Each structure stands twice: as structure tokens, then as C-alpha cells.
Amino acid sequence: MTGPALPRILIICGPTASGKSELAVRLARELDGEIVNADSMQIHRGMDIGTAKPTVGEMGAVPHHLLDVADPDRPFSAADFSDAASQAISGIIRRGKRPIVVGGTGLYLRALLHGLVDSPSGAGELRRRLQEEARELGNQAMLERLRRVDPQLATTIHPNNLVRIIRGLEVYHLTGIPLSRYQHEHGFAAERYRSLAIGIRVERRELYERIERRVDRMLATGLLDEVRALLEAGFGPELKAMRSIGYRESCDFLAGNSSLEETTALIKRNTRRYAKRQLTWFNADPEIIWLEYPEKFATILRHCIAFFE
């Protein structure tokens, strides 16, 4: 006997400046959907320019959720996001709309789809050893090993998804508790949603050029004024949100510690590095379908229509 069908959600992911927001709005219009933000910085009020929030036109065209829900001095963890996003998704589905989750914060997306488990001490060393064994033995052998200690979890994992295989083995060996049991006890099913993940593929040089243009545009449209207003409102440079890319460098400039030229170069460099880290994270997930946008929009739309049918 099978259980109830899992709710279906579409995920749009990829590095910063790849065009996720624009694609999500186009898809929402075509699919009668609503958008759930999964960018950890766009959560914060008053941080609009430096986080490249959707434009007024984009937000007016399609309902958006989880934008501007916390002040910059309020931490908003992956667990907080998972809870808030789940509520938003439930509301979207009740209204007969299709949920489209868009963002580049990989940990937020992982928390939403699979829940979070705190890493016990010693996890890093064990993870490295398991990764070495996977290189020697192959993914299938590691999946079979997981099946022996956590068969429920193993049935939900594709052999190519080495990240989840190793995570399951890691938790079991360090705690003696199958990850599937932990997830169940803490309110997370092995799978919470049926998801289709579309990643926007951009050639590296083109991505870096987009980043350069975006940073120039942010500075030209008032990033420094935005940061100054936040500081004057009492949100100090020591806050985690104010240490994020664009804001940290702007705080240093406003304090007289760097020139405008140096500030611009630093924001561009740090954004490129962040994009590389995002790609490393998302490339480790074999379930993501990578397609170019806007070139492959018709193909993306076909995938989405088939998924929701």
C-alpha cells in the first residue's frame, strides 16, 4: 500500500548572477505559480540593492514569499528557513498554485528537502575517509554499505548521490543511529517533497562578466547609500548580515579604510569566489538538471510542465 503523494515543488538554483529570479518569474507566469525565496540575504529587510532582490516589477507580476521577513540583526538559520518555507509552500498548494523555490543558498535548499542533522564531533575526519573509500570502491559499494545499516534511507538515494550516501554512513558511524530514524523522530521524512531541480548553467567567463556588470550597477544605483542607512539605523558592521559580500566592503569604505576603486574590486573578487563555492555545492548534486537560460527556456518549460502533470 502506497502513502499519499508527496507535494511537488520546482527548484531553480545556480550561482549568483545566473538569472534565477528572471527565470523563476517567467516560469511562474507560465505555470500559474508563486515564488519562495531561498536566498539567505534576501530574507533581510533594508538589504535590497546589495542582495539583488527581485525588482518591483517582478514582485508585482508574481507573488513572492520569504522576502523581507527579518531585520539584519535577527539570525535566520537553515532550520528557520525550512519551517517558514514549508508553511509558504503549504499555503501556495492550498490556493491551487505551484510552488517555485528559487535561490542560491544550498544549505537552505538541503534543509527544506531533507532536514538537518547536527554534525557530531569527528565528522570531518570520518567524511574524508569515507570519500577516499568511495573513490576506491565506487558509489554502488558505498550505497550497499549504507543499505546494511539504514535500508530505509538507502532506498531513497540514487547511486550517483554520493553526498547523501556519505552523510548517512557518517551519522550512523558517529551516533549509532540511522539517519532515517533521526529524521523521523525530528519531524523530517526521508523525502518531504517530490522536487524537480533546474540549475542555470552559465559559461564561467560569461558568469564573471555578469558579476562585474551587476556590481557596477549596484554601486551606481545606491549600494553605499543603502549601507549608510543601515548603519545609521543601528545595524552595526559586526552583524553577520552586515559582513556579507557587498556590505562588508561598503562598511570598510564608509569607515575610510578603502578607496572606491578598491571597494569595487573587492566586491567583484569576493562575489566571484562565492559563485565558485556555489557551483561546487550544486555540482555535487546529481539530481539537478543543468540547462542554459535564456537559450533553453522552452526545454526548461517542457521539463516543468511534464513534472507537474
Curated annotation (Swiss-Prot):
Gene3D superfamilies xref list: 1.10.20.140, P-loop containing nucleotide triphosphate hydrolases (3.40.50.300)
Top-rank EC class of the record's enzyme: transferase
Cysteines engaged in disulfide bonds, as pairs: none
Record's catalysed reaction(s): adenosine(37) in tRNA + dimethylallyl diphosphate = N(6)-dimethylallyladenosine(37) in tRNA + diphosphate
InterPro entries associated with the record: Dimethylallyltransferase, IPT, P-loop_NTPase
Superkingdom, natural source: Bacteria
Keyword field: ATP-binding, Magnesium, Nucleotide-binding, Transferase, tRNA processing
EC number: 2.5.1.75
Transmembrane segments: none
Chain sites annotated for binding ATP: 14-21
Binding site for substrate: 16-21
KW tRNA processing (keyword) present: yes
GO molecular function: ATP binding; tRNA dimethylallyltransferase activity
Entry keyword Nucleotide-binding: yes
GO biological process: tRNA modification
Chain intervals for the UniProt region annotation (Interaction with substrate tRNA): 39-42
Site (Interaction with substrate tRNA): 105, 127
Cofactor(s) needed: Mg(2+)
UniProt record similarity statement: Belongs to the IPP transferase family.
Record-linked HAMAP family: IPP_trans
PANTHER family per record: TRNA DIMETHYLALLYLTRANSFERASE
Subunit structure as annotated in this protein's UniProt entry: Monomer.
Function: Catalyzes the transfer of a dimethylallyl group onto the adenine at position 37 in tRNAs that read codons beginning with uridine, leading to the formation of N6-(dimethylallyl)adenosine (i(6)A).
Protein name: tRNA dimethylallyltransferase 1
Species this chain originates from: Pelobacter propionicus (strain DSM 2379 / NBRC 103807 / OttBd1)
Lineage, highest ranks first: Bacteria, Pseudomonadati, Thermodesulfobacteriota, Desulfuromonadia, Desulfuromonadales
